[in-house]
C-alpha cells in the first residue's frame, strides 16, 4: 500500500504498512483498484457525453464509489469486493449505450477493459499494481498535481452525494468528475494544463457546495441561531455522527414517541440550527467533540451510536455492540443499516441504560449561516465603519490528533476583543465552547456550520465585499485553516479558484504537494503555513 491523502499520513510522507487512520493494506489496495476501475468507466462517460449519452444512475454510483475511498469512510474489504465488479457492470452498460449512439468505445488504456479478479485476494493483488506509485516515470510535479486533482474529486463526490440524496444535482458536476478521472490516465498533459484542471476542480466544488446548500436549506430551512446543551438529559439515548441530514431526519421520525433522546456528535452539531430538524422535541443536545476523540467518548456513551458518513475509527470493545454504520460507512463486523431502517439502532438504544440523570452543563450556539449573518449585515457593516469590529477571522477546517492543532485553540483565545471569529467544520471543537462575548449585540464567535458550509462563508465574504465596494482580498478578513482529509482539499481548491490570497494553512502542509507546486501556490496565492498564534496575529493585525 501507499497512501498519503490525509494530513496525518505517516512521517508526513505516506502510509506504507498500515494507515494511520486504521486502514489495512488490503483495503488501501482495494480502494486503489476501485479508483482505477472508475477511471475506465470515466473514459466511456466522456465519450458518451459527446453523443448525448448521460446516465443518472451511473453518475450517482460514481460519486458513491469515489466517496467510499475518502479518509475514514469505509474500511470493510467485503464492501469493496462488491463495489469493484459493479463499476465494471456500469461501465459495460454505458459502453453499450455509447456504441449504440455512434460514440467511441475503443480505448488504448487497459483501464477501459479492466476485468476484476474473482477472489478478494485476486482483487488485492490487482490493486497493488495500480496505486498512487504506479507511474514512477512521471515528473514529481505532474504526479503532485494529478494526485491533488484526484483527492479534490473525492471531496466533490462527497458533497455531490449528499446533495443528490436531498434531490439536488447538476450534470455539469458529474461531467467534470468524468473528465478529470479520465485525464488522470493520460501522460501527455503539461504542467500548466494540470494546474488549470486543479483550479477547475475548485470551481466545480463551489458549484457542488452551492447544490448542497440549496438541498439542505431547501428541505430543512435556513439555520437559525440555536442554543445546544452539552450536558445530557435523563433517559435513553442515540448518538448520531457524520454529516448526513437525511439520515438524521429519518432517525428522528422513527424515534418519535419512543422515549429516546437524540444527540449529535462531531460535524452533526450544526444540524440543531435547521428548523426542519429542531422541531423534533427529542432532538436534544450535543455529546463529545471532534472525530479523533470518539474512541474515548463513545466508550462512555450509554446508548446506541450511528455513523452516517466519515469519520469512523476502529471501534473499541466497550461499545462494539452499540455502534452501527449506514450509507457508505463501513467497518468489518459492525452492523450496517440499509434503506434507513433504523430499527436495530432503536432496539439497542432501548436495551441500554441511557443517561441516569440530567446534567445542566454548558451550551453552545449554532445557526450562523449566510442567511443569519446577512440578515444583520447592516449591523456588521456599521460596526466595521465605526471601528467597533476591526477584523474578521475565519478559523475553520478539519480537526485531528496532532499536538500542533492546539495552535487553533490558542489563536482564538488570543484574538483581540474587537475582532470576530467565524468558524465551520470540526476544527471548531478546539474552541467551540469558549465564551468570547459580544460586539455590538453580535456574538464574537459564530458557527457557520459543517465543512460544506464554506459556501455560506464565501457568500458572506462576497456580500460584505460588495457592501464595502472592494474585493474579498481587501476585506478585513483573514482565513486561518486546518485540513485533514479530501473535502478540505476540495474547499482549498475552491478558495484558490476564487483568487483568495493570504490563506494560512496547517497544522502541516499536504505530503502530496511537491516543492515546486508549493512555490507556485505561494507565488500566485501567497498561501503560507501557520507559525505561532502570536506571530500570525502580529503579521495580520500589525
Curated annotation (Swiss-Prot):
<dbReference type="InterPro" id="IPR016100">
    <property type="entry name" value="Prismane_a-bundle"/>
</dbReference>
<keyword id="KW-0963">Cytoplasm</keyword>
<dbReference type="InterPro" id="IPR016099">
    <property type="entry name" value="Prismane-like_a/b-sand"/>
</dbReference>
<dbReference type="GO" id="GO:0042542">
    <property type="term" value="P:response to hydrogen peroxide"/>
</dbReference>
<feature type="binding site">
    <location>
        <position position="485"/>
    </location>
    <ligand>
        <name>hybrid [4Fe-2O-2S] cluster</name>
    </ligand>
</feature>
<feature type="binding site">
    <location>
        <position position="3"/>
    </location>
    <ligand>
        <name>[4Fe-4S] cluster</name>
    </ligand>
</feature>
<feature type="binding site">
    <location>
        <position position="487"/>
    </location>
    <ligand>
        <name>hybrid [4Fe-2O-2S] cluster</name>
    </ligand>
</feature>
<keyword id="KW-0004">4Fe-4S</keyword>
<dbReference type="Pfam" id="PF03063">
    <property type="entry name" value="Prismane"/>
</dbReference>
<dbReference type="GO" id="GO:0005737">
    <property type="term" value="C:cytoplasm"/>
</dbReference>
<feature type="binding site">
    <location>
        <position position="311"/>
    </location>
    <ligand>
        <name>hybrid [4Fe-2O-2S] cluster</name>
    </ligand>
</feature>
<feature type="binding site">
    <location>
        <position position="426"/>
    </location>
    <ligand>
        <name>hybrid [4Fe-2O-2S] cluster</name>
    </ligand>
</feature>
<comment type="similarity">
    <text>Belongs to the HCP family.</text>
</comment>
<comment type="function">
    <text>Catalyzes the reduction of hydroxylamine to form NH(3) and H(2)O.</text>
</comment>
<keyword id="KW-0408">Iron</keyword>
<dbReference type="GO" id="GO:0051539">
    <property type="term" value="F:4 iron, 4 sulfur cluster binding"/>
</dbReference>
<feature type="modified residue" description="Cysteine persulfide">
    <location>
        <position position="398"/>
    </location>
</feature>
<feature type="binding site">
    <location>
        <position position="15"/>
    </location>
    <ligand>
        <name>[4Fe-4S] cluster</name>
    </ligand>
</feature>
<keyword id="KW-0560">Oxidoreductase</keyword>
<dbReference type="InterPro" id="IPR011254">
    <property type="entry name" value="Prismane-like_sf"/>
</dbReference>
<dbReference type="InterPro" id="IPR004137">
    <property type="entry name" value="HCP/CODH"/>
</dbReference>
<keyword id="KW-0411">Iron-sulfur</keyword>
<feature type="binding site">
    <location>
        <position position="243"/>
    </location>
    <ligand>
        <name>hybrid [4Fe-2O-2S] cluster</name>
    </ligand>
</feature>
<keyword id="KW-0479">Metal-binding</keyword>
<dbReference type="GO" id="GO:0046872">
    <property type="term" value="F:metal ion binding"/>
</dbReference>
<feature type="binding site">
    <location>
        <position position="267"/>
    </location>
    <ligand>
        <name>hybrid [4Fe-2O-2S] cluster</name>
    </ligand>
</feature>
<feature type="binding site">
    <location>
        <position position="6"/>
    </location>
    <ligand>
        <name>[4Fe-4S] cluster</name>
    </ligand>
</feature>
<feature type="binding site" description="via persulfide group">
    <location>
        <position position="398"/>
    </location>
    <ligand>
        <name>hybrid [4Fe-2O-2S] cluster</name>
    </ligand>
</feature>
<dbReference type="GO" id="GO:0050418">
    <property type="term" value="F:hydroxylamine reductase activity"/>
</dbReference>
<dbReference type="GO" id="GO:0004601">
    <property type="term" value="F:peroxidase activity"/>
</dbReference>
<feature type="binding site">
    <location>
        <position position="21"/>
    </location>
    <ligand>
        <name>[4Fe-4S] cluster</name>
    </ligand>
</feature>
<protein>
    <recommendedName>
        <fullName>Hydroxylamine reductase</fullName>
        <ecNumber>1.7.99.1</ecNumber>
    </recommendedName>
</protein>
<feature type="binding site">
    <location>
        <position position="451"/>
    </location>
    <ligand>
        <name>hybrid [4Fe-2O-2S] cluster</name>
    </ligand>
</feature>
<dbReference type="InterPro" id="IPR010048">
    <property type="entry name" value="Hydroxylam_reduct"/>
</dbReference>
